[in-house]
Amino acid sequence: MVKKEKKEVTYTVIKLHVDNDDLKTYFEEMAFASNNLTNVIIYHCRQWFFYTQNLYYIENDIKDVKFHQYDSEKIDDLRKHMYIYNQNLSKKGKDQIDFVNFGLDAYFLHYYFKSIKQVDYNDKTLSSQTSQQITAKVTQTFKAFKKSLFDYFKHKEKYKAKPELPRYKKKKSMSGFYFTNQVCTIKNNQIKFPKTKLTLPFTYEYKGRHIRTEVIRKYNEFELKLVFEQDPKPKLKETNVIAAIDLGVNNIVAITTNKGQSLLVKDKSLKSINQFANKEIARIHSAQTILKPNSKVVSSKQLMKVYQKRNRRIEHFMYCTASIVLKFCLENNVSKLAIGKNKGWKEDVPFKKEDKQNFIQIPFNSLIFKIKEKLSCYGIEVLEQEESYTSKASALDFDKLPVYNRKSANTKFSGRRAKRGLYKTKQGILVNADLNGALNIMRKAFPKVEFETTDLKYLQNPRTIKNITNSQRITMG
């Protein structure tokens, strides 16, 4: 039997914010039910983990460890149903499941909750498919935890702390959930939801097949994420054009190719968004504590609105920036892109206080994700590159680029920073400091790369975008 090749697809997400009060009430009921069910599943997964972990300690004669306490009646009941479940699998000619090693999965829990008529799993507020999806999500989280835990004991140097067992959600709080396209549909420019006649207008133009709708609670509001499956766009032919990006505060993106094209994105609005939000947050905190100086700052509708407005504006900024990067790559036939990123780069930032605050509040991980998402649709390979010493080394002098460690701390380089924004090479040539960093990131990611060293206009007088919301306004210098 010949296996069919898996069809390659891409995904598009459209976000909507729910303003309708009736719909908010509808989603609140489901979010409460989702939270209760999530805690039920977490309880069962935690109990089974405690039981199997104790077995592991006993079988491997591991001493000086604290044994976990668990609900023995629940474990006995789970084991009884596991036996029946595996017997049913055998009758169907399927392999039995080793629950001790692999843990609980969504299929077994679906069978188990149906068998014992678990109240939260069979809650009529949630559709059966939504309950199944919540179960799958929690069990996957536990499997990922167990995998990382075993890896932690083998390679502790890779981790900053021991992976934590997934915790319970707060009682009487709300958790996210999602609908499949079987229960939540789009017809006649309206989104129809299960178990209600309420609808939500949907006037966006979209291509592809709607596959699911995620419902997320954010800042006391509900956000919908409609996911569409699309055929991939025509992939670009493999070229020898390589690009690299250096991310920063003043120049959000400094991108250059090995063929002598470059671009700076230096819109200051992102810093303004953060600065305005910080002032508003400080004002609200001050108003809360002015009468009681030692009292704790509490969440409020005012604070939620400030955070919400800031995050929406920043997310829009990041989408626009990712689109500019995509446009640059398509215009210059780029087939591979390296983005500089250091592990834990937001935890030990060697900047002055103002720049450090701006750096930490810029969601670079979100920007990297959006760039990857957009470029992958066109077959452009994107990789993250460790970037230690890329800002200190001289790209034009081909300085060696070690990975940071104690031995490399005293490494000397040919050039130096002349002043803010400029780098001076060994020959005294002044180039843009961020583009020098981008070239070094390229050299680290692709050691055999050859780049333009004769015509340095792309390093000295690059194209610049100063307003991302109007990316056609490109100036020189």
Predicted regions and their residues:
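Short amphipathic alpha-helical coiled-coil/interface segments
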Residues: S34, M82, T135-F142, L303-V306, ...
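Stable alpha-helical structural segments in soluble proteins, enriched in small hydrophobic residues
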Residues: I41, Q133-F145, A433-A445
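Acidic carboxylate diad motif detector
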Residues: S72-K218, Q357, Q361
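Positively charged, helix-rich recognition surfaces that bind polyanionic ligands
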Residues: F222-G477
